[in-house]
Amino acid sequence: MIIQQWSLLKKTKSFEFSFEIGGFYSRDNYKIFNQDRFIIIQNMGAPGLITDANKIEISDLEWDKFWNRIDLLGVWNWEKDYIDKGILDGIQWELMIDKKGRKRRRIYGSNKYPKNFEALTNLINEISKMNGEIMGYSED
């Protein structure tokens, strides 16, 4: 029993995931992150003001599928920043993924997105059970 608990604790502490997207005073500002095996979803009406929050337990199998798809999307090879300097306001986003002891990336964007960003937002919608609430922006 103790070995099973240690194995579970070790697995849940082996990664971090965080994704934020939204615009200044937009009603669709989201922060989605893991807390051990759980996904925490915060909807912020204004910067720093949480208007709604949910906590969903994610199975080990779902987490394994999530990380496999992160690998398939090539997110580890994305640029550090995607910024459209011609637009001063709009949509900003940030992704932080950390496979403890293996890989870590923090990627930021402002009105610009990697080519397969929409596939990432679909994946995040899927694991967070948000039914498409995060819009799938894409680079044209």
Task: Locate the predicted segments by residue.
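Short, well-ordered, aromatic-rich surface patches in folded extracellular/luminal domains
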Residues: 1-22, 56-57, 61, 69-70, ...
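Hydrophobic/aromatic beta-strand elements that line small-molecule binding cavities or substrate pockets
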Residues: 28-33, 53-56, 93
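Generic short beta-strand segments
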Residues: 40-42, 72-75
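Aromatic/basic micro-patches that form nucleic-acid/chromatin recognition or nuclease catalytic surfaces
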Residues: 66
